[in-house]
């Protein structure tokens, strides 16, 4: 292999490494794990990675401050270079990465030549709303993703191009949203507004209702006291953790039939309608860290239920599952119910209603005098066979490590012998 061939191979692998670093976006967090208390952004800066430009950074047409991989000529990487202004962006660039700099303004001429841009990452800078020239993003007809998280924004950026599909605005100081700010965002599928200063008044006019393709809405860590009104029926993932929501209106979710995941932990929920979560497509439900005193109806397709840190004293299984249909069993597999006020494990009748359950995490419970108690069974696991048991041991992690376990016969519940015991 000649010298030129070796150089080409080297450039290829370097380009793939850089490209993969920025293009591996996740739709959302892993449903198998409890959401972190600290909101996770799409891109995480790693201290042990060298983000400086390689020696061959001066690719034809690339800004001198940045790096344009030869194998990915449409991408320009300008991150972590202590830039105070946006460098010149060539017309052929489609992705520009400017995160972890000291940029304070986005001027009208920032993208004047870069009309082919599909993705802009300006996260982790010092940008204020008044320093964004009006319409600077709206002039980009091909823009699909816009990252502005971890800045100093006070207003929702407006106007934006109707081509936009994903916008990240978490970790700002946004407290205002114009009524017509999102009217033209007909293609938006993901809106991240976590860690801002949004209260009920900001969403009163049902400003989100016209986003007919919206699938993921993140409103965690804001100042909401009630459920946001007028959400689009296309929604599949709704994050409302760490607000001050105390109730959910009757029939609130009737217009959200596609909802797959609902996270409303760390709020002030107390009494909620019995069948409020009767959603046929719901897979994950997190209502932990509230003030709930009793269980509620569990929809048939729900798999993961988080009830930790509430005030539940007794779990009435017949409330969760009023009837048993042998042809259409419930799909529930995991329950987390630690840090409640249980005095005994859940009735074994639960395995007739929910035959697919294989983990119930009881952990510690709160006693009436404020001290913690431990039930005889802290972790209930059901192993279908020896292979499942070995596989679980290989992946044993988290708070369940300290619990005791019970192994049961998966086919016992539902048998004639079981029927005679109830």
Curated annotation (Swiss-Prot):
Residues 1-20 form the signal peptide. LRR repeats lie at residues 92-113, 116-129, 142-164, 165-184, 187-207, 213-233, 234-255, 258-280, 281-294, 301-322, 331-353. One of its GO terms (biological process) is cell adhesion. Coiled coil: none annotated. Keywords: Cell adhesion, Disulfide bond, Extracellular matrix, Glycoprotein, Leucine-rich repeat, Proteoglycan, Repeat, Secreted, Signal, Sulfation. Residues 385-422 are annotated as: Disordered. The N-terminus is blocked. Glycosylated; contains keratan sulfate. This is Osteomodulin. It comes from Bos taurus.
